[in-house]
């Protein structure tokens, strides 16, 4: 019998095309795997790495201020954010204690036990984030008992997962009882992506506030905005506000420089750019991270947008007693919209045991 060569499927062709395209591009080198780690706990690792980022940044800030230095500082900040984004899932898992929950349906014959130990969580972190590969970290990421849920039957038997083309079933290896298996996902998982984007955007807002947005504003734009202030007979420094700069940029067709409104306002007024201390900037970021889960819990079901960033930073500044910062965060003009944000904010404050200060 003559063997007939198997024809390539469309999937095979697509895979070949993708492989060819990837081979034409120089991919970013990934961190090589090590065999050991200098850290012994997740808490120690996170604190140690954050401190390392801060020390690198401080060393550059204390040196000569050049464009190259600013680019390096910006890269360190991006690396720190990416590190935190990679680490957050393991921090959340680390806080989960070993729990046992009974399946509540009347016809259910199985019990599910979630096994998430601190040791295995740290080992998985080492493998995925620190790139530490050794027998213990490999066991942590491959052993079903540390990753998946363990199902047991009421008779004491262990479950086995049987999968066919139409459904998956849990089958007891002792009494033969069966139950459909349905994977479940937490709301946190589906919203983590948006939370990460918000954290990145907050970092951009804080950079803009301090004139560190990295975009050079042409002198012609500065002159055009300055001319608008002159036309409107605005000359005192207290009246040259970022909100007014944004209004003039829109009028002049320079909306692409919205992120530079603080820099432009400072250049026209002659007031030095605001500088936040590292401690205050870190505190603002920490507070922002803390409100993510409470916001998701208390937001109206149909609401897709997050709270106004100006509103959030305004409320943070109030809580921290940084009243001199309030002028930099203009609030929404509509009382109804402000009230709607206050309603959510009050619930967030209750959850976190923060003082609630009404806006309207």
Curated annotation (Swiss-Prot):
GO terms for molecular function: zinc ion binding. It comes from the Viruses. A zinc finger (unnamed) spans 153-175. Pfam families: A2L_zn_ribbon, Pox_VLTF3. InterPro entries: Poxvirus_VLTF3, VLTF-3_Zn_ribbon. GO terms for biological process: regulation of viral transcription. Keywords: Metal-binding, Transcription, Transcription regulation, Zinc, Zinc-finger. Belongs to the nucleo-cytoplasmic large DNA viruses (NCLDVs) VLTF-3 family. Putative transcription factor. This is Putative transcription factor A494R. It comes from Paramecium bursaria Chlorella virus 1.
């Amino acid at each position: 019998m003559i063997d007939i060569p198997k024809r390539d499927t469309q999937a095979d062709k697509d895979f070949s095309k993708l492989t060819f395209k990837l081979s034409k591009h120089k991919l970013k080198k990934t961190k090589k795997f090590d065999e050991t780690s200098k850290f012994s706990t997740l808490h120690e690792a996170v604190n140690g790495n954050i401190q390392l980022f801060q020390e690198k940044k401080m060393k550059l800030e204390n040196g000569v201020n050049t464009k190259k230095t600013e680019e390096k500082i910006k890269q360190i900040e991006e690396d720190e954010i990416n590190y935190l984004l990679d680490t957050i899932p393991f921090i959340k898992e680390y806080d989960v204690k070993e729990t046992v929950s009974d399946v509540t349906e009347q016809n259910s014959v199985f019990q599910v036990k979630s096994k998430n130990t601190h040791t295995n969580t740290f080992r998985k972190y080492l493998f995925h984030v620190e790139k530490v590969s050794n027998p213990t970290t490999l066991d942590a990421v491959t052993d079903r008992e540390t990753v998946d849920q363990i199902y047991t039957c009421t008779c004491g038997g262990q479950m086995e997962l049987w999968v066919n083309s139409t459904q998956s079933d849990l089958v007891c290896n002792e009494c033969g009882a069966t139950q459909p298996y349905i994977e479940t996902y937490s709301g946190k998982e589906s919203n983590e992506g948006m939370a990460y984007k918000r954290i990145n955007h907050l970092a951009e807002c804080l950079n803009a506030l301090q004139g560190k947005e990295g975009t050079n504003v042409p002198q012609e734009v500065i002159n055009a905005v300055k001319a608008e202030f002159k036309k409107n007979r605005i000359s005192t420094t207290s009246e040259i506000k970022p909100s007014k700069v944004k209004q003039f940029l829109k009028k002049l067709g320079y909306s692409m420089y919205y992120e530079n409104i603080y820099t432009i306002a400072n250049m026209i007024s002659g007031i030095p750019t605001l500088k936040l201390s590292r401690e205050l900037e870190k505190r603002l970021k920490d507070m922002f991270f803390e409100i993510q889960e409470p916001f998701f819990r208390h937001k109206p079901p149909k609401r897709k947008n997050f709270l106004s960033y100006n509103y959030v930073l305004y409320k943070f500044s109030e809580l921290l007693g940084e009243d001199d910062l309030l002028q930099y965060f203009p609030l929404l003009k509509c009382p109804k919209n402000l009230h709607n944000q206050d309603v959510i904010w009050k619930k967030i404050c209750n959850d976190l045991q923060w003082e609630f200060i009404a806006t309207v």
